[in-house]
Swiss-Prot record:
Belongs to the MDM10 family. The keyword Mitochondrion applies. This is Mitochondrial distribution and morphology protein 10. It is a multi-pass membrane protein. Component of the ER-mitochondria encounter structure (ERMES) or MDM complex, composed of MMM1, MDM10, MDM12 and MDM34. Associates with the mitochondrial outer membrane sorting assembly machinery SAM(core) complex, which consists of SAM35, SAM37 and SAM50, to form a SAM(holo) complex. It comes from Saccharomyces cerevisiae (strain YJM789) (Baker's yeast). PANTHER family: MITOCHONDRIAL DISTRIBUTION AND MORPHOLOGY PROTEIN 10 (PTHR28035:SF1). Lacks alpha-helical transmembrane segments, suggesting that it resides in the membrane via beta-sheet conformations similar to those predicted for other outer membrane proteins and porin. GO terms for cellular component: ERMES complex; SAM complex. It is found in: Mitochondrion outer membrane. GO terms for biological process: establishment of mitochondrion localization; mitochondrial genome maintenance; mitochondrial outer membrane translocase complex assembly; mitochondrion-endoplasmic reticulum membrane tethering; phospholipid transport; protein insertion into mitochondrial outer membrane.
């Protein structure tokens, strides 16, 4: 489940019209969400409150080997945070959890018909207006968190300098570990590409990220290729000035919709030339209540590979919104009645309605001009070709919009998430839902392999409440056991 402060941060980005979908850091966010979701390792309780329209507080408790907790505080001078924030009772489940990310094609200034809030879908018309608004007001966000009993501190400051630029400062301080790290980010987003300059006091690390979007210019006919597909290419470069350790990677992402069903899908291909690691992912919304993801990893140097799968199954509420009662899983193309009857009554004409009638134009030609039969036939063929092509585009666009509207108008009560890896031989199960105003996450990670604990870090071993005893390894047979198990409650007002 998305932590409360992350929900506030998302609301800040939406209120200031900053889109995170252009960030190279989030270029593979969809596959990470479906495959690497976090499993609670203890009993966790989070209580949050919006004390004023601009201040937010959160208190966390967890019981692992001992009682741990943290206290968070956030302040922002953004004026429309309450428009995007919901308490745990009112927030839709698809907005409270991390799930498949539907991207908003860049430079597409058509008005979206969905009303449901999304972490990455901002109103593009507002973005366009903001980019040309000379009265831009700088906004800021201040966040701090203290952990106990360790007394570790973390802080973050975000400053919107202009409609295209943003400055971010993050800091972590740990007295026990004698660790103090400060990281600065300067981001510039032109919609076509986002550039990010990074500097960290840890090893004097310098970094540069860039992500460039292709297929972003609308065509003359507003076709589905330009409106519903996007191709992005990004890269990152790192250098530690103290140790002179370099790092780099590049990723290609393609996002589109199926023109037959309207369902979105995302493809990514990543490459790290220094470590020889290649990764490809395929993520798709297979239905309004199901999602599937597959990931293949391969290393050129060690010849090791891994195949991972993840999926989601959403449970809908039986009583849906009035506009969604008669919806079914079959998505029909645009009806002839909508196409042919009274087109002037609609606010926006369909594309094929803008094609001029060449036959009527010919009839207006003076009778003194004699048009040969073969030219008349050519005019008729052109009229039919343009009209049928644009009609097909309208049908594809209508199918995609119907699928999006079905998701936006659905009320989901719970979701099951599953993820498995063939090399690690693990199975992660997570259930998330709402109960009496609480957002609940409960899950476990099942292990099927002997070498699992040897592959864990010391922190992960300490987090696991259950371990394999010596008797479990008798005869080389290890039973299935839960390496992690926990439940998390969130409540906010």
């Amino acid at each position: 489940m998305l932590p409360y402060m992350d929900q506030v941060l998302r609301a800040f980005y939406q209120s200031t019209h900053w889109s995170t979908q252009n960030s190279y850091e989030d270029i593979t966010a969809t596959s990470r969400t479906l495959l690497d979701f976090r499993i609670p390792s203890a009993i966790h309780l989070q209580i949050s409150n919006k004390s004023t329209p601009n201040t937010f507080n959160s208190l966390d408790f967890s019981t692992r080997s001992r009682i741990n907790g943290s206290l968070s505080y956030l302040y922002s001078d953004a004026q429309q945070l309450e428009k995007f924030m919901r308490n745990s009772t009112d927030i839709p489940l698809q907005d409270a959890t991390e799930t498949y990310r539907q991207l908003q094609p860049n430079l597409n200034y058509s008005v979206s018909s969905g009303n449901t809030l999304s972490s990455d879908n901002t109103t593009v018309d507002n973005d366009k207006k903001l980019l040309h608004d000379s009265k831009f007001v700088k906004k800021s966000l201040y966040y701090g968190r203290m952990y106990y009993p360790s007394s570790d501190l973390e802080a973050m400051i975000i400053k919107r300098l202009s409609p295209q630029t943003q400055f971010m400062l993050k800091g972590v301080s740990s007295f026990k570990e004698s660790l103090n790290v400060l990281t600065c980010y300067f981001q510039r987003d032109s919609h076509r590409n986002l550039q990010e300059w990074i500097f960290s006091t840890s090893d004097l690390l310098c970094g540069y990220r860039v992500l460039h979007n292709f297929l972003t210019t609308p065509s003359k006919f507003n076709t589905s290729l330009y409106n519903n597909s996007s191709l992005s290419l990004g890269a990152e470069f790192w250098l530690g000035l103290v140790s002179l350790s370099p790092g780099c990677s590049t990723t290609l992402r393609y996002y589109t919709h199926s023109t037959n069903t309207g369902r979105p899908l995302t493809l990514t291909l990543s490459w790290n030339p220094l470590f020889g690691h290649i990764s490809s992912t395929y993520s798709a919304k297979t239905g309004t209540n199901s999602t599937f993801c597959a990931k293949y990893d391969f290393n050129l140097y060690s010849i090791e590979s891994n195949l991972s799968f993840g999926c989601e199954f959403w449970q809908k509420k039986h009583h849906l919104l009035e506009t969604n009662k008669n919806n079914n899983d079959k998505l029909e193309p645009i009806s002839d009645e909508l196409v042919d009857i009274n087109p002037n009554s609609r606010a926006t004409k369909l594309l094929h309605e803008n094609v001029p009638d060449l036959n009527s134009a010919v009839n207006d030609i003076p009778s003194t001009l004699d048009i040969p039969v073969h030219k008349q036939k050519l005019l008729n063929d052109l009229t039919y070709a343009f009209s049928s092509s644009l009609r097909k585009i309208d049908e594809e666009r209508s199918t995609i919009e119907k699928f999006d509207n079905k998701i936006n108008s659905s009320i989901f009560t719970s979701v099951w998430k599953l993820s498995t890896s063939l090399r690690d031989k693990t199975l992660k199960l997570l259930w998330e839902g709402k109960w009496r105003g609480f957002l609940i996450s409960a899950g476990t990670e099942l292990v099927f392999t002997r070498g699992f604990q040897e592959s864990l870090s010391d922190d992960e071993k300490n987090d696991n409440a259950i371990s394999i005893s010596a008797t479990d390894t008798e005869n080389g047979n290890i039973p299935v056991f839960p390496a992690k198990f926990g439940i998390q409650f969130q409540y906010s007002t």
